[in-house]
């Protein structure tokens, strides 16, 4: 029998799914062998069909119901100021949570199984939690319990690096409401208390809130730290610091917040931006439905990024040397020096904590592109700092101090600050799955539940076992 060669596959005819944008940018080509390669197609973003139902959520101590036509967190997204934001959150804490058992099955229905998984458990959702946009019923209820968890911290002293707005602000509030004395640092000392004094319970904690008297810039930590240590010692006493939260970090440089393509967006409000998203096809690109999307109120006075593109969408060759150096100094060098100078000044007790705020960008086992490479490197360095200081937990043979407890926490995606107006008008962003209170709850979780040192990250209140 005559032997015939097997037919070779014509690689040019293979239906290749579109390559990564970054590969197109640098002009590289995939190398193929004689074996056909099948690329997994990108999933199209699909609008999930929801039942137009309205939920009646029972209000404790009242014969009334809270009527919801969308998950409650959308009301928090649109709160115009920190006072209203807190009041809306307190309403759930005080009026809804006591009767949580009565609303275990209160969910928004989906007509078909969603291709988008639950934010926590990653299983396909058939119903959406009454409070969260992207969580199933079980995970949503668990998240609410942790969101409103607390602990008696009277007599404890804490330092929150970067505590003026957003995540650091909410972390400081959680510690203050637990009874802790808190010092915050910020680069803007003159308006450091601008938002704290708008809180409805400000008078209850104002005597325990302190601001470091000088502007603190992580990029210049070496010059600032001796004075910070002295001020902490004068305020709390020698070796009386119990909690150190390393929150401040630079991701995007906003100093050059202008370019020659911004004219189209220069005078737009957030509401007008949202309207443009809808007009430019945002409905086809967004999840959840557009009618569940809300105007993201800028409660903290942050200026919208009016550039057509920023370094979040640039590769390392397009990013300025100054920004690369600034991000590395703030995230890596600044964090190392803070630990070096402040950990020796902490109380010698097992019930003391250092929390590094990690990020997904710093993990090695997730897909990476060439975008914001310098940020990824900086966040990975912070994760390595946690790993070295915390050790290998129970398998560690190196003798280490029993205090403080070292943790790294990934707070999750709760902000859209890194996206420019240009990206927002193209419908390329979504409602984040959680808000800054949820993110802060994740950060303080090891403190409130007195967890021992862990060398990797905490994600969604659980230990992450990969690096």
From Swiss-Prot:
PANTHER family: OXIDOREDUCTASE, SHORT-CHAIN DEHYDROGENASE/REDUCTASE. GO terms for molecular function: oxidoreductase activity. Signal peptide: none annotated. This is Uncharacterized protein R665. It comes from Acanthamoeba polyphaga mimivirus (APMV). Pfam families: adh_short.
């Amino acid at each position: 029998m005559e032997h015939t060669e097997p037919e070779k596959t014509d690689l040019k005819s293979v239906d290749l799914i579109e390559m990564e944008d970054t590969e197109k940018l640098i002009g590289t080509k995939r190398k193929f062998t004689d074996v056909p390669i099948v690329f997994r197609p990108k999933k199209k973003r699909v609008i999930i069909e929801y039942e137009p139902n309205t939920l009646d959520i029972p209000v404790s101590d009242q014969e009334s119901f809270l009527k919801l036509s969308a998950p409650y967190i959308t009301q928090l997204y649109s709160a115009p100021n920190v006072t209203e934001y807190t009041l809306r959150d307190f309403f759930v804490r005080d009026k809804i949570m006591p009767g949580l058992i009565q609303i275990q099955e209160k969910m928004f229905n989906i007509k078909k199984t969603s291709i988008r998984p639950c934010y926590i458990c990653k299983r396909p959702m058939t119903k959406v939690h009454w409070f969260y946009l992207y969580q199933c019923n079980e995970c949503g209820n668990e998240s609410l319990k942790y969101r409103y968890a607390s602990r008696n911290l009277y007599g404890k002293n804490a330092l929150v690096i970067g505590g003026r707005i957003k995540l650091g602000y909410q972390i400081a509030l959680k510690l203050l409401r637990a009874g802790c004395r808190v010092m915050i640092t910020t680069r803007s000392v003159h308006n450091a208390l601008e938002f704290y004094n708008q809180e409805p319970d400000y008078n209850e904690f104002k005597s325990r809130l302190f601001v470091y008297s000088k502007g603190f810039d992580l990029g210049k930590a070496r010059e600032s730290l001796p004075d910070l240590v002295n001020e902490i010692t004068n305020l709390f006493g020698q070796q009386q610091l119990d909690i150190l939260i390393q929150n401040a970090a630079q991701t995007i440089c906003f100093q050059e917040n202008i370019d020659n393509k911004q004219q189209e967006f220069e005078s737009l409000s957030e509401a007008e931006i949202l309207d443009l998203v809808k007009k430019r096809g945002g409905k086809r690109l967004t999840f959840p439905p557009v009618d569940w999307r809300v105007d993201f109120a800028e409660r903290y006075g942050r200026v919208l990024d009016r550039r057509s593109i920023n370094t979040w969408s640039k590769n390392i060759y397009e990013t300025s040397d100054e920004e690369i150096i600034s991000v590395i100094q703030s995230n890596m060098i600044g964090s190392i020096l803070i630990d070096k100078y402040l950990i020796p000044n902490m109380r010698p007790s097992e019930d003391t904590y250092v929390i590094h705020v990690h990020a997904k960008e710093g993990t090695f086992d997730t897909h990476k592109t060439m975008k914001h490479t310098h940020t990824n490197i900086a966040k990975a360095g912070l994760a390595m700092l946690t790993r070295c200081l915390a050790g290998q937990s129970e398998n560690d043979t190196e003798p280490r101090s029993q205090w403080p407890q070292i943790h790294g926490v990934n707070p999750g995606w709760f902000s859209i600050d890194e996206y420019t107006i240009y990206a927002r008008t193209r419908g390329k962003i979504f409602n984040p799955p959680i808000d800054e209170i949820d993110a802060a709850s994740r950060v303080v979780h090891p403190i409130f539940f007195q967890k021992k040192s862990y060398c990797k990250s905490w994600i969604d209140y659980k230990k992450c076992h990969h690096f």
